[in-house]
Amino acid sequence: MATINQLVRKPRVKKVVKSNVPALEACPQKRGVCTRVYTTTPKKPNSALRKVCRIRLTNGFEVISYIGGEGHNLQEHSVVLIRGGRVKDLPGVRYHTVRGALDCAGVKDRKQGRSKYGVKRPKA
């Protein structure tokens, strides 16, 4: 426990909290244009071809975003919405594309967990 004299000389310093998603600039989502759509491989011990895209955001940031779900319709110059959320086995991927918003279509034939993949309720 510090004495009052010590605290007067050198006060306590608050820890600075660093954002995990700096490109969003405290917004829930951001819009951007795809500059490159490609696949990449995850870290060990996983193995796959993960679909990702490089995006130039409206605020000038250039980020890599993961495209979730089976199949997508994105190509260069597609306008997409991104949200925060990293992909644990892809280094440098800190954002997700929002399916079913702007140019990114929802996942075809999706029946469960539809809201996460931009799919409307099917007709009964």
From Swiss-Prot:
GO biological process, one term: translation
Gene Ontology cellular component terms for the protein in this record: small ribosomal subunit
Name of a matching Pfam family: Ribosom_S12_S23
Ribosomal protein keyword on record: yes
Sorted UniProt keywords: Methylation, Ribonucleoprotein, Ribosomal protein, RNA-binding, rRNA-binding, tRNA-binding
Organism domain of life: Bacteria
Keyword Nucleus tagged: no
Entry GO MF terms: rRNA binding; structural constituent of ribosome; tRNA binding
CDD domains: Ribosomal_S12
Secretion signal span: none
Modified positions (3-methylthioaspartic acid) in chain numbering: 89
Complex formation: Part of the 30S ribosomal subunit. Contacts proteins S8 and S17. May interact with IF1 in the 30S initiation complex.
Family of this protein: Belongs to the universal ribosomal protein uS12 family.
HAMAP family: Ribosomal_uS12_B (MF_00403_B)
Biological role stated in the UniProt entry: With S4 and S5 plays an important role in translational accuracy. Interacts with and stabilizes bases of the 16S rRNA that are involved in tRNA selection in the A site and with the mRNA backbone. Located at the interface of the 30S and 50S subunits, it traverses the body of the 30S subunit contacting proteins on the other side and probably holding the rRNA structure together. The combined cluster of proteins S8, S12 and S17 appears to hold together the shoulder and platform of the 30S subunit.
Protein known as: Small ribosomal subunit protein uS12
Organism encoding this protein: Haemophilus ducreyi (strain 35000HP / ATCC 700724)
Name of the gene encoding the protein in the UniProt record: rpsL
